[in-house]
Regions:
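Conserved C-terminal portion of the radical SAM core fold
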Residues: 12-14, 51-68, 90-95, 117-118, ...
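Short low-complexity, flexible loop/linker segments enriched in glycine and/or proline
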Residues: 48, 109-113, 134-136, 172-175
Length: 191
């Protein structure tokens, strides 16, 4: 029996545990972990693509596969764009989660050329609150990254992890998100 509905098949992949920030609420402890090599990652992408094809053939199902790439901070991997290209070549839609600090215009353009469907950037509130949580200088750098993404037409979600430090900042964040021109504003679990 075959169905015409394509089932979403998504994987969130933490490509690295490394991060350029040390956020108060983050479970990433800044410890050093051995990362998969580029060849190991490419092999895993191939295996996942083959598995989806086998399931499709065996069960008569259609899939809409995607990877959401995150970390740590995925832009700390020098081979990030090689990885994204390999995912795209295997038919995966691409999404990223980032703190936005390392996203310059060139990176935003490359993401757009790859057809990235969306990037989620974390902002924890207005500047003072954001920098209390994420570190000095991170607010303006994240806003700059968001601006580059918006300029390329990539859909951007601003995400705020709610806590006692920023819980009163929800309404200012709605205004900020609107002013930034982002498509979505999300709120993560209370920590």
């Amino acid at each position: 029996m075959s169905t015409t509905k394509a089932f979403d098949f998504f994987i969130q992949w933490h490509l690295t545990e490394r991060c350029n920030l040390r956020c108060r609420h983050c479970y990433q402890e800044g410890r050093s972990f051995q990362e998969l090599s580029l060849s190991e990652i490419l092999g895993t992408i191939e295996e996942v693509a083959e598995m989806i094809t086998a399931w499709s053939d065996s069960y008569g199902l259609s899939f809409s596969p995607s990877f959401t790439v995150t970390g740590g901070e995925p832009f700390l991997r020098a081979d990030l764009f090689d990885i994204l290209e390999a995912m795209k070549q295997k038919g995966f839609e691409l999404f990223l989660l980032s703190n936005g600090v390392l996203i310059d215009r060139d990176k935003a353009d490359r993401l757009s050329q790859l057809g990235v469907k969306g990037v989620q950037v974390s902002l924890e509130g207005p500047k003072e609150i954001h920098e209390t949580i994420r570190g000095a200088g991170s607010f303006s750098a994240s806003l700059e990254g968001i601006g580059h993404l918006v300029a390329t037409g990539i859909p951007v979600t601003v995400n705020m992890t709610l806590s006692k430090l920023n819980g009163e900042s929800v309404f200012p964040m709605i205004k900020l998100a609107k002013n930034l021109g982002v498509q979505r504003l999300g709120f993560s679990r209370l920590v």
